[in-house]
Each structure stands twice: as structure tokens, then as C-alpha cells.
Amino acid sequence: MQPADKDLPLMDDIRLLGRILGDVIREQEGPRVYALVEQVRKLSVSFRRDADQEADRALKKLLESLSTGQTVGVIRAFTYFSHLANLAEDRHRIRRRAVHERAGDTQEGSIELALARLRAAGIAPQTIAQTLAGSHVAPVLTAHPTEVQRKSILDAERSIAQLLAERDDIQARARLYDGANDALTPRALAANEALLRARVTQLWQTRLLRYSKLTVADEIENALSYYEATFLREIPEIYAALENALGQHPVHSFLRMGQWIGGDRDGNPNATAQTLQYALGRQAEVALRHYLTEVHYLGGELSLSTRLVQVSAPMQALALRSPDRNEHRQDEPYRLALTGIYARLAATLKALTGGEAARHAVAPQNAYASAQEFLADLRVIEDSLTAHHGAALAAGRLHPLIRAVQVFGFHLATVDLRQSSDKHELVVAELLATARVQERYADLPEAGKRALLIRLLNDARPLRVVGARYSAHAQGELAIFETARALRERFGAEAIRHYIISHTETMSDLLEVLLLHKEVGLMSGTLDDAAARNQLIVVPLFETIADLRNAAPIMREFYALPGVAALVQRSGGEQDIMLGYSDSNKDGGIFTSNWELYRAEIALVQLFDELAASHGIQLRMFHGRGGTVGRGGGPSYQAILAQPPGTVRGQIRLTEQGEVIASKYANPEIGRRNLEILVAATLEATLLQPTKPAPKTFLAAAGQLSQASMAAYRALVYETPGFTEYFFNATPIREIAELNIGSRPAARKASQKIEDLRAIPWGFSWGQCRLTLPGWYGFGAAVAAFVNLQGKTPGAQLALLQRMYRQWPFFRTLLSNMDMVLAKSDLALAGRYSELVSDARLRKKVFAAIEAEWHSTADALSRITGDQQRLAHNSALARSIKHRFAYIDPLHHLQVELVRRWRAGQDDERVQTGIHISINGIAAGLRNTG
């Protein structure tokens, strides 16, 4: 099949959805608006596809002449088209995967291909199962200030995606019949199109924007929709596929879900003990309602009679405990048992959440004390079915339910707690001052803090003074710890396992959190107590370049303290360490950020390998990756395989942020594919990755590139006078901050300093103006400096970089991501944004520097990879970008125009609305944001 042929169904879907959108616009807004949108579309397409300069000039002139009302109408049209094009592309990805599977081809990143590679390497299924038994893979959903999708929009788009899937099914069935005599297919397609038209009309008449600030509760509800749509059903399917592939070897529940929403307090004063309670209450409700539904349907399926089969004694006992006294079911033990199980689940739902089951139980029953107790009842049913040759009956619904309970329990997902180290210090200082243990704790040198904290950790007495009044901050923070302890008792130990310390800079940052754990009873005993345990894993988050360099030294000092290693070992023997991609990039640029992350991982693995001689502590890296390449984004499969040798070992947690969640997990089939990628990459990185470190020449070269890259990046961002002014004017950062798109502020402090700006809106803003600067800046300068290093031959230096690209996954993946970012950038459009900077000298100086480095980086990539065109090895993405640009361009032009009007004082609410819708449309069109 020719490349163009295989994409014909995609083009058909885009044309269909575009035609329906056009019809809806004409119907809803009138023929004039439709004609205007069409005129803009044709001019933009002519310029992008044919390089028609006359069309470009006509387009700019037309867009600048539009009234505010016309502008908003055009922006809405192209924004919705971006959303619909995304749905068509997602459908095509699923379609192409099905084609590969039917042909017996296995896609890169699939579990099938990973297992085939393991078999080819001589690795037995038993070894794979044993590896998985000791593994832990967890995507962690987080809410961020740039998540621009409303749940109402996501729900409507899910409906459209389902209708596109049904349309494929109709056409597939039609191919089995004689088209000339097929009267059914045209009717079915027409009915399908009518439903699509209704959903597109719904989209057009649904607000894209929120008119009130998103709350933490809203973010929790948004996240829960992905469990209902994807995770609860697709994760058990992945396990079933693995068990089928591995034969008789059972697969441990290593793939689990994590969540920050409700427990992430870093920079978010709206996250409190109450939101944490709400998060776990709602999570439990979603899990339990899923189980109730499955148990109900299971009761309908297992109508087996003891007149025909003999059930096991435990099964008979379970049936006898049922409150169901219906005489028609007395010979149907499975139904009786499931009626009782349903009643107990309904009681559990009531006890844990206060909610009522959708279908009333036949009689009140005691709630389950734990998910394990519920699981034990399901196991009784499974064992009995297997004993009388009813295993086939268990495969369809019972096995997925059992796996779901193993994975999701009554808590659904593990909620991480996170707070900044300086906030902990404030609480500790207040406790110590109030107890008259230490005045002005914060002023102590690091050594003094450590000595005091260790002494207090070895003292069984509490610090809180009865009757003393503490600040609202101290009360709020202590309430979080106390609530966490109570919620673990209520929902199970898996409900909350990790306590993350943002901005970990010193060892005292870790000790302060241990002390607070001890104060509220999360840590039992004292540090020198041989029976002491801590309920939570204390997770340092190393974010800046300096902190990444200090990560291993800090952890070495921490574990050298008497009692620490023994405490961790007694508490489960796990140590997660989180690495921040976002702030390290904002601090030092793309190459240095990635290089220092790489070095930190190697150093940490070496440290814990040394500790293994005396204490068996499992190290697990937690990657704080964002959606954009500048924040650690990019394909997960390549990213995991590019980790340093020996750093995965079956253990990985990684954040899924912003629009990435919707693009990866809104569609169940695509969600499953993305989850499979995490599993496949973890298996390959653990069992196939070479254990030898990269050649010393490669490591030395990367160090030199990093030094030069960081110097170039910081020279622009932190050392160029006026750069901050340029950034705040040449990007829509101020307008992004006004959007009601997240529950926490876009900046940690109210200032105009780059240092105080969150890394997420920083990257989001550069994407909106199409410079994508955090994803590439500094690399061109670094390569030029490296190739022309004094005393070295330029040809030999370049040849070394080319060898690194061919042989070193870390270097190849990093350059591949830069290649993608450059392909999505557009200097001409970025130049339009730079015109928003009123200071002409500043504008020219900064933009000229950025433009020169862009060309330098593009040239460096071409020389190293040998590819003169961007995305030479990813033709599907290259085509997608080419088609999309023509529809995103008008949004950029109109955004610049509206931002200019808004900043000039035009206070028409429609101007602000237009800006905000354009932000949404561009984010959807580029398919990555924060």
C-alpha cells in the first residue's frame, strides 16, 4: 500500500468532520460567517501548501480588517476544527494498529514485540514473570495550570470518537457484501452522520472556556473521567494479554495508577486536608461503583444450577451466607453469592463515601473491611468455577474484575502528597519556637539544623504544646499529615504512599518531613528505635541544575545517618527519588537539563548499589515529565529506553500532565496503547538494555556540550538585559495567567521574574508563539563550540557526535525530540509575536539572537543526523504537522491582533474571549501544552 493510500481514510474523516462543521457554522451563524471562514481557510491553505506569498499577504490583510465579533467567530471555527482533526487522527492511529495486527506485524512499543524480543534473546517466560513480580510501573496523573480542556468538551469529543469507530465498523461490514445491492450501508452511514452532526452542533453550542476558576474538586472530577473511560477496563485487559502470552506463569499486579490531584500542595493554597479527603472519597466511589456494576452483570451470567454442576464447599458456604431468599434461586449458588457480595459492596460504598448503590441490595449486610476481603470472595467463585470446568465463564468478566480489585483496591489510585521544603521549614520552626526548643530555627546553619533534627527524631516526646495557638499555615500542614494517616486506615495503605518534597536542596529538608511524620504518628517510634517504622515513603524532588548535581551527595549523607537505612528497610525497603525535568530546563536549558538528569540517575544507582551490601532498599526513579519536550515530554517508549543502563530495573513512575492526559487516555484504545508502551519499554530496559555505561568519550563530549549549551541558554534568558520584558510582551503569558484553566497560580510568587514563573506556563507560552524555545535553545551554540574546540579537528569532533547519535540512545532520543520541536516551530509566526514588544531595539536584539540560534540548532541537527529535512524518520507526524499548520496559522495571526488590542486598552469582553479561545485552539492544534 502506498503511503498516500493508507492515509486516505484519515483524509476522508477530516473532510467529513470539516464538512459537518461547515454546515453547522452556516446553520448556526449564517452564510456570511461561513463564507468568511472558508475564505480564511483557502488563503491559509494556499500559502502553507503552495508557498503562495500573495495568499499570505491577502490573509494578513483580511484578518486585520475583521471586527471583534467576526474575529471571535473565525477563531471558534478553526479551534473546533483542530479538536475534530485530533479525533480523526486518533481514530486513524487505532485503524492503522488494527491493520498491523491483522497482518501479523507488531508495532514498536507493543507488548507483543517486547515479548518477541525477549524470547529471541533467550529469556524464558518464567524469568519475565519473575521480573514483573518485582516491578512497579505507575503513570501518575497531575493537574496543571495549562490544562485547557473542559470536561463537557471532552465528553462530547468522546461521543464523536465513538461514532467514528462505529462508522469504521459499518464500512467494514459493507465490504463483505455486494455494494450494488447493499441498501443497509447507506442508511447506516446516514444515521451515523446525523448523530455526528448532533454532536458537532453540541460542541458549537458548548462553552470552550470556563467563566469561573477551576477548583481542585473540578480537577479531581476531570481526572476520574479517565478511569471510567479507560483505566478500569483497559488495565485488566493488558494483564490478560500478558498472562496469555506467558502461559501458565501468573503476572503480579505491577502496573498501577498514581494521582497528585487533591494531594499536591506545592504552590497551591487551594489543596487542603479537605480536598485530600474529597479526592479519596470520590476515587473510592468510582472504584466501588465499577465493582457493583460488574458484580451485578456477573450475577446475570452465572446462572449455574447445582442440579447440573457441583460447586466447591467454600462456594456453597459463600452462597449460604447470602441474604437472598428468593426461592427461584436456591439451586443457583453463584447468583446467591453474588447477591450477597453486591449487598456487602453497597454497604462498603455507604460506609466509605456515603453514597447509595444504583440498584438496592436485597438486604442490609456488613461492609467489607478491606479490598482483600472482597477479593477473597471473588477467588472463591473463581476456584469453584475452575473445579467444575467453568473456567471459560470466569474469563469474560470475573477475571478482569479480580484484576481490577488487585490493581485499584477501594482507593482507585495512590494519591501522592507534595509540598515545598520551605513550607515544612516554617512549620518546624513554629513548633520548635512554641515548645521553646529552638528560637529562630530557620537561621541555624545546615549543620545545626541536622544536629537538632536528629536529636528530636530520637526523642519520643511530641513537640506540640497543649493549648497553644498555632498559625493557620502550621495547622493546615499538620492537618494534611493527620488526614493522610486517617485515610490510610480507612481506604488501605495503598491509598497514600508517597510524600514528595519539592525543592529538596539539603538533607535537613528530608529530616524535617520525618520529624513532622513522627509528630502526627505517621512515623512510629524514634529513629534509634529498632522497631520504628514510617508509613510513607519520603521522596526528595531534585529540580534545579544545582539540586540535580547534589542529589546523590544529599542521599548519601541521609543514608549515612544512624537509623535511617534501617528505618527505610523496616518500612518496606523502597526509596523513590523524583527528578524534575521542568525547572531544570528553565534553569539550564534543554541539553544541560537532560544531561544532569542522566548523571544524577547514574550517581544515585551507584549509591544504592553500594547500600545493597548492608540494606536491600529498592530505588525507584520518579520522572517529573511534562507535555512539551522542554519539560521532559516526547515519546515515552524512547524516553524509557534512553535511561542510563541499570536505572530502570522494573521500577518507574512518571507524571502525565496537562493536555497529555487527554491525548493519551481519553480514547480507551489509544489509552491501552500508551499503557502498553510503558510496560513494553520497562521490560526491554530491564531485561535487554546493555549494562555497560556509555563510552567515556561520549560522556566527556556530553559534558562539554552541556557546559556550552547552558552558557548560551543563560546568556539569553538570565543575562540579556530586557529579556524578561521581551518574554512578557512577545508571548501571551499574561493572557494565559488570566485563563480559568487550573486551580493553582501560574507563578509561585507575584513577580515579573523568570525564576518565579512556573515552568509549565513558561513552556506553554513559548509554544503559543511557535518558538518552542525551551525544547532546543543552546544546542546549536554548544555544537559549534564543540566542533571548533581549540586543539581539536572539526571533522573528528563532528564524527564523534555522529557516532554518539548512532550508538547512544540517550543522545539519539534527545536529538529526535529537538527535531520534532523545531518542526513544530515557525520563525515567521514568532516574528509576528515579537512585534508586540514596543521597544524596537529590544525586540530586534532578542529576536535576532533567537533566530540565529534556531538556524544554528537546525544546522547542527542536520550535520549530526544526516537528515536535511525535519522529521525525516517520522513521516506520519511530518504529514500531520504539514496538514495542521494551515488551520493553526489563522489562530496565531488573530491571537496577535487581539492581544495587541487587549493590551492597548480595548476592554471589549469579546477580545479577551477570542484570545482565550485561540489559546485553546493552538494548544489543540500543536497537541502538547504544559
UniProtKB/Swiss-Prot annotation:
GO annotations of cellular component type: cytosol
Keywords, ordered alphabetically: Carbon dioxide fixation, Lyase, Magnesium
A Gene Ontology molecular function term of the record: phosphoenolpyruvate carboxylase activity
EC number of this enzyme: 4.1.1.31
Cofactor (UniProt): Mg(2+)
Cross-referenced HAMAP family: PEPcase_type1
Protein name per UniProt: Phosphoenolpyruvate carboxylase
Naturally occurring in which organism (per UniProt): Verminephrobacter eiseniae (strain EF01-2)
